[in-house]
Amino acid sequence: MLHLSEFSGPDALLVKSTEGCCSEPSTDLTRLPARDPPAATGYPAGDFLSWALSSCGAGEYLTDSCLLEGPAPTPPPGLGYSGSFFIQAVPEHPHDPEALFNLMSGILGLTPFPGAEAAASRSPLDASFPAGSDALLPGPPDLFSPDPGAAAFPEAFWEASPSAGAPSQCLYEPHLSAPDVKPGLRAPPASPALDTASAFKGPYSPWELLSAGAPGSCGSQGGYQAAPEARFPTTGAKIEDLLSISCPAELPGGPASRLYTMGTYDAFPLAPGDLGEGAESLPGLLTPPSGEGGSSGEGGEFLDGTQPELSPLGLRSATADLPKPLVADIPGSSAVPEPPVPPPAPFPPAKARRKGRRGGKCSARCFCPRPHAKAFACPVESCVRSFARSDELNRHLRIHTGHKPFQCRICLRNFSRSDHLTTHVRTHTGEKPFACDVCGRRFARSDEKKRHSKVHLKQKARAEERLKGLGFYSLGLSFAAL
């Protein structure tokens, strides 16, 4: 049983006038002042329609909803209704809000509730926004809400709600699939009349979802400000979450906190010095867990007592922990144990660069010729000669090419070498600068002097042999005295 007196509240019911309204509705409607209207004096408790019509004619509070042209019409005579009616609920659909609203619309002459087809055609994303040009008008409060302040529409939501036919200005709208839509989650009706969804509340009510001061609604500037739990996490928060998962701050040495089972990676332990500078921040890796052998004291003491010989790379060989079988245990082998395998020799130190005797200024990569090193080879395939200096190689190449750049001015003879031209000119001038030390004979070329000196050496050798035969050699007589 439902009485009309139950619909009385702090806000008056708004009636949508269909006659005399402006032909071009304004899309930028100003919200009504959020203050309580004066008490309707002289009307019964349930006669809200008469009070609304009289207020519209007086132009006191409902001027935006009426928008009448010309003088205000005479208020009709008061309409009162008192009584009660019963609604027989169908077992499948108990307390159907649409049926009740259609009945109330027929009695009060209000706009009927939109049908199921129109409600189904709306997207679930539009469930948070009312449809129609009068969406900016405040709706009735939740009659059965324990907190009347939480049941009212928030001011910031209706101030920034999009008008009819305009797309949503929110930057982010949550996508709700069909199973996620709650049965009691409905859009506010197109008519500003009674919303029966608030009278028969479901598991969730739109007034509860749009509570006052909700940060998830559109602000007055038109930008969306998501709730703290609905916002995307910042990049810093994501990095901190990843670091907290992959790099825990502390790694205690207990058995329950080990990342792997015992014996999985124990074949390659590291010495404290091999871990570098970060070994101080890893106490759990160097300290043996309690109850696993050894004392649970400092990790350095434990490793100093149990760590075997390390290779140059700082890793222990995989066979160090495995027990080596004795030779006597192997069938068919002698009882003589094998000699111990010597540890691997460390890497030899790099040899320092050998410096020259005088500490020459040339480095090891210098291309200067070394003594007795012939770095310049003849490029001719049939010639195998090589030279220590580049000018000698150039002089040698003139033999293969036949080039003779030096010419005698007297006889116009050409020579491939300058020293040959010099000795040739001495033949014309008669100059003999080289003299023999024994006989004093003079020569124009140095090689001729050397050849002549060999003659004197042979003569000396023959004279000594002759003296030996005569016996004068022992007396000390010289060859010149004979």
From Swiss-Prot:
Q: What is its main location?
A: nucleus
Q: Which domain of life is it from?
A: Eukaryota
Q: Where in the cell is it found?
A: Nucleus
Q: List the keywords (alphabetical).
A: DNA-binding, Metal-binding, Nucleus, Repeat, Transcription, Transcription regulation, Zinc, Zinc-finger
Q: Name one GO molecular function term.
A: zinc ion binding
Point out the signal peptide segment. none
Q: Which InterPro entries match?
A: Znf_C2H2_sf (IPR036236), Znf_C2H2_type (IPR013087)
Question: Some GO term, biological process aspect, for this entry: which one?
Answer: regulation of transcription by RNA polymerase II
State which tissues express it: Expressed in brain. In the cerebellum and frontal cortex.
Q: Per the record, where are the segments of Low complexity compositional bias? A: 280-290
**Keyword Zinc-finger set for record:** yes
Matching PROSITE patterns, A to Z? ZINC_FINGER_C2H2_1, ZINC_FINGER_C2H2_2
Task: State the residue spans of region: Disordered.
Answer: 274-357
Zinc finger region(s), C2H2-type = 376-400, 406-428, 434-456
Compositionally biased, Pro residues: which spans? 337-349
Q: Can you tell me which family this protein belongs to?
A: Belongs to the EGR C2H2-type zinc-finger protein family.
State its role.
Answer: Transcriptional regulator. Recognizes and binds to the DNA sequence 5'-GCGGGGGCG-3' (GSG). Activates the transcription of target genes whose products are required for mitogenesis and differentiation.
Q: What is this protein called?
A: Early growth response protein 4
**Species assigned in the record:** Bos taurus (Bovine)
